[in-house]
């Protein structure tokens, strides 16, 4: 009964308001729900259910799901049914079903976590190889029902890989440079606050439920940049409570570790992995954790990267470091995921060393270590060689590890891809990675087969998704971004799944069965990654974001001239990294022969990776016949134009989605449309300034509808030179003369009488909440505040730059000829009410 009450409490939240908390598990009524009643079960029969375990959870999930979707109450029968024709759902393990006298001869072979689902009218059989598998099968059955799929079926489903984990980059404390959740845009940590585990772990239980519903099986609950205090007695007790919250859903808990903990926490004078005291210390800590959490999944370790300690301090190898933890885990059956994200961020020198290349680091550090890792070590490899860019080639390290299992690290949180403020559906990108054939030894070597263990006959391997949910009821900060979490889980289970089919499953369960709703969200989502790539970074140049600050707004110059290694090597004549063997960094040579030959040769390198592998003049012709620079111009205009269509598309389904979620999504799509223009102008102006080559279409730098703020009549405002220059339309904006007096910028309008859209581009810094008022003559058109830092969840910035640039548009404004437009800016805190420009746009025109 306790399980039932808890689950009902969790599900009941969605009935109060459609705030996103239930995500795709709303169990909302489907069209014509009552007409299905005769084909639905009336009884739930859980086999060998124990309170707080997955079979028990499955039973109550079925009760709530069938009631929510169809309005039909079903009863729970806690003993084996004696009538095989009874309209019942029987749920349990294969073993329990056989022990109860069931016929398992027709059940296909199942592996750990696999399940068998048989639906014959109202008689349903859900069997798992283990309890977790039975729960997965239950969720699959309910998700079919939630999509209106009630027809008879019979099939088995096995996971593609044993490791289907989530990484949460949650910090024990808020503050610092990365807040409560590093690269998290959905609010504070659901696990930690003020240096300890939260008292209320309701959201942890809800999270486990979501993850189990898509076939995931473990969560690393703390940041890879780990704080050693996660291992204090109080916090080990606390993480045991998190594990308790996860356990009803079959989700296991794992921890990120700080390599130097024996010294920084344990009081030793060393953290050398060969020192017997260090070995004993880790063994004792691991024993203590398993006493508290007998089903703990294992550890995640980031070592010798971006300031994190590791074995290099003592001239030990990465294998030595990984094996330290692996051996401590072996008596308990645990696994260590050891990150391949290892590079020197302090000494890489772009200017002095043409062959220096961060993309080479993983292979250079791990090559030759393959036979040395313990069997319970899995190398966790980012999908690309750099860092979750809008497009990268597959990491070559997957081809270098045959005796050691590997897992692909994918990023659900959109660190470089719009931080959930821009719609970017990531499944098509991930599919390109998982379907890529590395041709190891001239044989089929698809990435998904490598990480599953099939290609090299490894028993371990799989997936690690960096998700970073928070306390926001949308989980990720955006309702639409949750499609990425859903797709991640589904692809980890079955990498052959289709991106569109996954998306449409999610839409029906999250929003509506209405075909127009399905079509609109499908169109927007499937166009979103190409659009973002077009207006952020093309041809493999990487996401041209500000890599030195929040990884959010445009700042292409920040890529170069520093040791972070995300270089473009752009100068006045040419652009791109030469990663060839014959003349460059040799990165192409890290790939197996067939792939190496493709990337080494500029003629066979795909255009979308041209600048990743080759340094070329701006006038280099692509396979399309366009020059590189003209492609940049065209792509940025095309991508930003696509983003404008998302707003109008979304508006067509108004009234078909609840108001709360409709308005929340609309706000972000309007913001994205404006910020896409900021991206477009910043990148095109930057490369026009650098190359001196004009846009053949005459668009770049030519904005006839704009009025630059610095050209207006100013009272209490003054011009300000923006850095980087391309972040402002004319390199300048205006700011109030001081932080206590309002400013006014005015200009007569030279337009004909009529209706126009008035767009104002401004900067919303995270150091105050300025207010702006827009007037036509003495009439107030509109007012807004600089409070996006409280709404969007993106990385905050105190600067006037591409991260804080924003746009507001007032539609269908009647303007009389010779009217005077004025903007009054009222500063707040340290924010001086900055304005970039105003556009007076004929209706339907985007400048």
UniProtKB/Swiss-Prot annotation:
Location(s), subcellular: Secreted
Membrane among keywords: no
One of the GO BP terms on file: xylan catabolic process
EC numbers on record: 3.2.1.139
Activity sensitivity to pH: Optimum pH is 4.0.
Database matches in InterPro entries: A-glucoronidase_C_sf, Glyco_hydro_67_aGlcAse, Glyco_hydro_67_aGlcAse_N, Glyco_hydro_67_C, Glyco_hydro_67_cat, Glycoside_hydrolase_SF, Hex-like_dom2
Catalytic activity: an alpha-D-glucuronoside + H2O = D-glucuronate + an alcohol
Transmembrane regions: none
One CC-aspect GO term: extracellular region
Temperature dependence: Optimum temperature is 30 degrees Celsius.
CDD domains: CBM6-CBM35-CBM36_like
GO molecular function, one term: alpha-glucuronidase activity
Keywords: Carbohydrate metabolism, Glycoprotein, Glycosidase, Hydrolase, Polysaccharide degradation, Secreted, Signal, Xylan degradation
Any coiled-coil regions, as ranges: none
Function summary: Alpha-glucuronidase involved in the hydrolysis of xylan, a major structural heterogeneous polysaccharide found in plant biomass representing the second most abundant polysaccharide in the biosphere, after cellulose. Releases 4-O-methylglucuronic acid from xylan.
UniProt-recorded name of the protein: Alpha-glucuronidase A
Protein source organism: Emericella nidulans (strain FGSC A4 / ATCC 38163 / CBS 112.46 / NRRL 194 / M139) (Aspergillus nidulans)
């Amino acid at each position: 009964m306790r399980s039932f009450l808890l689950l009902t409490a969790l599900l009941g939240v969605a009935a109060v308001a459609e705030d996103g908390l239930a995500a795709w598990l709303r169990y909302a009524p489907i069209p014509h729900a009552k007409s299905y009643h005769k084909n639905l079960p009336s009884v739930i029969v859980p086999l060998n259910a124990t309170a707080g375990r997955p079979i028990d959870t499955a039973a109550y999930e079925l009760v709530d799901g069938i009631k929510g979707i169809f309005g039909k109450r079903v009863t729970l029968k806690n003993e084996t049914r004696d009538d095989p024709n009874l309209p019942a759902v029987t749920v349990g393990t294969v073993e329990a079903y056989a022990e109860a006298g069931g016929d398992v001869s027709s059940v296909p072979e199942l592996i750990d976590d696999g399940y068998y689902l048989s639906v014959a009218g109202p008689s349903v059989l859900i069997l798992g190889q283990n309890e977790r598998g039975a729960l997965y099968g239950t969720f699959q059955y309910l998700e079919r029902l939630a999509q209106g799929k009630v027809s008879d079926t019979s099939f088995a489903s096995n996971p593609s890989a044993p490791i289907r984990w989530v990484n949460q980059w949650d910090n024990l404390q808020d503050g610092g440079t990365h807040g409560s959740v590093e690269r998290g845009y959905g609010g504070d940590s659901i696990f930690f606050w003020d240096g300890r585990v939260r008292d209320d772990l309701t959201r942890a239980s809800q999270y486990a439920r979501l993850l189990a519903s898509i076939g995931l099986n473990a969560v690393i609950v703390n940041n890879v940049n780990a704080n050693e205090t996660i291992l204090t007695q109080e916090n080990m007790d606390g993480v045991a409570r998190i594990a308790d919250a996860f356990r009803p859903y079959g989700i296991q808990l794992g921890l990120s570790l700080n390599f130097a903990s024996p010294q920084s926490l344990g009081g030793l004078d060393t953290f050398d992995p060969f020192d017997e005291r260090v070995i004993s210390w880790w063994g004792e800590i691991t024993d203590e954790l398993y006493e508290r959490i007998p089903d703990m999944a294992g550890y995640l370790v980031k070592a010798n990267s971006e300031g994190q300690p590791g074995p290099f301090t003592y001239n030990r190898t990465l294998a030595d470091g990984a094996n330290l933890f692996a051996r401590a885990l072996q008596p308990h059956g645990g696994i260590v995921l050891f990150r391949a994200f290892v590079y020197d961020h302090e000494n890489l020198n772009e200017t002095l060393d043409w062959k220096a290349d961060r993309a080479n680091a993983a292979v250079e550090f791990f090559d030759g270590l393959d036979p040395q890792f313990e069997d319970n070590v899995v190398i966790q490899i980012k999908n690309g060689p750099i860092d979750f860019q809008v497009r990268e080639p597959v990491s070559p390290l997957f081809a270098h590890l045959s005796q050691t299992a590997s897992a692909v690290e994918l990023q659900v949180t959109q660190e470089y891809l719009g931080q959930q403020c821009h719609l970017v559906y990531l499944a098509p990108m991930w599919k390109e990675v998982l379907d890529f054939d590395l041709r190891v030894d001239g044989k089929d070597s698809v990435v998904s087969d490598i990480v599953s263990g099939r290609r090299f006959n490894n028993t371990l391997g799989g997936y690690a998704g960096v998700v970073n949910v928070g306390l926001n009821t949308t989980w990720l900060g955006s309702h639409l971004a949750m499609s990425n979490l859903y797709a991640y889980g589904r692809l980890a289970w079955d990498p052959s799944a289709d991106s569109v089919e996954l998306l449409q499953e999610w839409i029906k369960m999250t929003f509506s069965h209405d075909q127009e709703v399905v079509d609109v969200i499908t169109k927007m989502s499937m166009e979103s990654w190409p659009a973002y790539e077009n207006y952020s970074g093309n041809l493999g140049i990487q996401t041209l974001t500000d890599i030195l600050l929040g990884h959010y707004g445009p700042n292409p110059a920040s890529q170069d001239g520093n040791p972070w290694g995300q270089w473009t090597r752009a100068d006045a004549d040419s652009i791109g990294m030469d990663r060839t063997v014959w003349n460059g960094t040799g990165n192409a040579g890290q790939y197996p022969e067939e792939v190496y030959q493709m990337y080494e040769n500029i003629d066979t390198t795909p255009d979308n990776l041209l600048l990743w592998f080759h340094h070329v003049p701006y006038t280099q012709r692509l396979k399309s016949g366009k020059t590189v620079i003209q492609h940049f111009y065209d792509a940025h205009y095309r991508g930003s134009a696509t983003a404008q269509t998302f707003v109008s598309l979304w508006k067509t389904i108004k009234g078909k989605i609840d108001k709360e979620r409709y308005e929340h999504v609309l706000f972000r799509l309007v913001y994205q449309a404006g910020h896409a223009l900021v991206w477009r102008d910043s990148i095109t102006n930057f490369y026009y300034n650098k190359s001196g080559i004009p846009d053949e279409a005459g668009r770049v730098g030519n904005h006839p509808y704009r009025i630059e703020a610095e050209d207006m009549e100013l009272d209490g405002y003054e011009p300000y030179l923006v850095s980087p220059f391309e972040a402002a339309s004319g390199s300048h904006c205006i700011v109030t003369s001081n932080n206590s007096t309002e400013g006014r910028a005015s200009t007569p309008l030279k337009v004909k009488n009529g209706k126009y859209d008035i767009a104002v581009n401004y900067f919303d810094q995270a150091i105050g909440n300025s207010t702006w008022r827009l007037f036509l003559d003495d009439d107030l058109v509109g007012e807004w505040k600089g409070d996006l830092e409280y709404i969007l969840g993106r990385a905050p910035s105190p600067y006037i730059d591409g991260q804080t640039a924003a746009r507001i548009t007032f539609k269908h404004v009647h303007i009389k000829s010779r009217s005077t437009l004025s903007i009054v800016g009222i500063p707040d805190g340290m924010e001086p009410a900055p304005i970039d420009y105003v556009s007076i746009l004929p209706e339907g025109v985007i400048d």
